[in-house]
Regions:
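Acidic/polar-rich alpha-helix caps and helix-coil junctions
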Residues: 1-119, 157-294
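Residue-level signal for threonine
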Residues: 48, 149-150
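Short, cationic low-complexity segments
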Residues: 122-144
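Extended polysaccharide-engagement surfaces of secreted carbohydrate-active enzymes
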Residues: 127, 153, 169
Length: 294
């Protein structure tokens, strides 16, 4: 029996939680959950076999268990997930942008709500409200949060199609007919990726755009990382190239004949650009040298 002398519970070790809770739970979910095709339309947004496999791949990658991470990435791929033809197809409030072929786990939102931040019936997304250029009138709300830095913007390679679909900068394509000016933010930039125009969300609490928590591009980059860390650097080119090709970076020579260290840097760069502002960066940096990578 447990002693009652010390009433303060002690903290379990990290590895105990991983090995006895997180991994068994996700393994069981992978074995028992339906695939996305087995769900009805009414069940869209529920966790699937693919979601469990993708999350388990992240866990194994974090622990440096690369063979098992690769196994789970392959499991996701075998379930039929694919990249959307266009990067911007992954984001937006239109029905065509929701639960796409690339989406593995997606938080569902509903724009018809009367409640504010604290309302229990509030089912709208707030990303567009928070990230729209401050006081621009381009989106409902527009607080101007999460402004990209110059250092981040400089990471885009010439010809990368994702730049114009991720950030607003002076000279970028207009947003709903509106020209962006550098004076609209402190850094000269705002996030574009999650913005929903007034025509689709007229107020700050009416945004129906979903949020993709896990998508296939992430899995492909995890697969590339696992292969490279296993010493299979040439094989890592394949999933990496798939992601870069959609972004318009079609010169295969840019990622060929690299050392393991060079490929590692390429993959890390690609994750930063492909998954920008989607909530993965902090976890990636912790995984890479306990945050020293930053």
């Amino acid at each position: 029996k447990e002693s009652l002398t010390n009433k303060t519970p002690f903290r379990q070790s990290k590895m105990k939680i991983y090995n006895e809770v997180i991994i068994p739970d996700l393994r069981e979910a992978f074995n028992l959950l339906p695939t996305r095709e087995q769900y009805s339309n009414a069940d869209k947004g529920r966790a699937t076999k693919g979601a469990a496999a993708g999350m388990l791949a992240k866990v194994y990658l974090t622990l440096g268990r690369y063979s098992e991470a690769l196994e789970m990435c392959n499991a996701v791929e075998n379930l039929g997930y694919t990249l959307n033809p266009d990067y911007s197809d992954c984001f937006g409030a239109a029905e065509r942008n929701k639960n796409t072929a690339e989406s593995i786990f997606e938080i569902q939102y509903y724009g018809l709500t009367k409640d504010d931040f604290w309302g229990e019936e509030n089912q709208a997304s707030w990303l567009s409200t928070f990230m729209g250029p401050r006081n621009s009138g381009w989106v409902g709300g527009a607080y101007g949060w999460n402004q990209p830095t110059q250092e981040f913007v400089d990471q885009y390679e010439a010809g990368d199609l994702r730049k114009d679909k991720t950030i607003l900068y002076e000279g970028c394509p207009n947003f709903e007919g509106n020209a962006y000016r550098a004076s609209m933010s402190n850094t000269g930039y705002n996030v574009r990726k999650f913005l929903v125009p007034l025509s689709q969300s007229p107020d700050f609490n009416t945004n129906p755009a979903n949020f993709v928590a896990l998508r296939f591009a992430d899995v492909l980059l995890m697969k590339a990382e696992a292969l490279n860390e296993l010493g299979r650097t040439t094989e890592a080119e394949v999933p990496l190239y798939k992601v870069r090709t959609r972004a318009g970076l079609t010169n295969r020579a840019d990622i060929e004949n690299l050392t393991q260290t060079q490929m590692r840097e390429k993959i890390r760069h690609e994750r930063r650009i492909e998954l920008a502002f989607e909530g993965h960066r902090w976890f990636d940096m912790i995984r890479w040298d306990n945050g020293q990578y930053a």
